[in-house]
Amino acid sequence: MALLTKSTFLKGHQCHKYIYLDKYYKKEKDPLTEEQRKKYEGGHIVGAMAQHLFRGGLDVSLISKSRDVLVVETKKLIEQGHTILYEATFEFNNVLVMADIIIKDGDEWKIYEIKSSQKISATNRIDAALQYYVINGSGLPIKEFHLSCLNYPRLEVIEMKMEDIPADLFKFEEVTSFCKELLIDTEEKVKDLKTTLALPSIPNIPTGEHCNSPYTCEFIGFCNRPQEEINEGLFS
């Protein structure tokens, strides 16, 4: 089983304490808010719309709930000649990622990461760099890596019917060169986060602005509790 995923990598990029708690103390997470739930649901809807626009693919995630199995199945499907895959799963250096859409172009592949916002953020680019690092490292030849975001407000988009999706629903930004430039930095960050996860105890990092940037941490409630109360909860 992979030690890191795209999700945990981004959490660790935000805060080392965040990734540590997420790995070993999941039960301490704050309850999911209604706003967060709607955002996750909206992301799934937008993802389905992207698959509708890039028709003819096979959704690898439907094959199994085991990510280890999905890595093997992705490799098999590529070897069998499939040219469009959704949620293709790759592992390299004990890091696992799932690519939203991959499309074969000649002997190489174009990767598309779908975002449900109207702007591409710095965090989205870091996300892309990690995916490039893993997919390239796994041996798949990458021709281009694209980030995509919405041309229309998300709340409008998630109310659209599939048959009414406009051809220009998404705008695309190619970030292949950026991802290549960050290969060494990404590998160093992976190494750094693995070191953090090997620590014998929770990193001592105080709360601050980073708790809400770029995303709201899921452990703010835990970190704001008095230290004595935290110790009692962890060791009782």
Please state what every model-predicted region is.
Residues K119-A122, V134-I220, N224-N231:
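Metal-dependent nuclease catalytic regions and adjoining charged, substrate-binding loops involved
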Residues R67-S148, Y152-E156:
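Well-ordered mid-protein domain cores that form the structural environment of catalytic cofactors
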Residues M1-E108, N231-S236:
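Metal-dependent nuclease catalytic cores that hydrolyze phosphodiester bonds in DNA/RNA
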Residues H16, L21-Y25, P31-T33, N124-I126, ...:
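Generic alpha-helix signal with a bias toward terminal, lower-confidence helices
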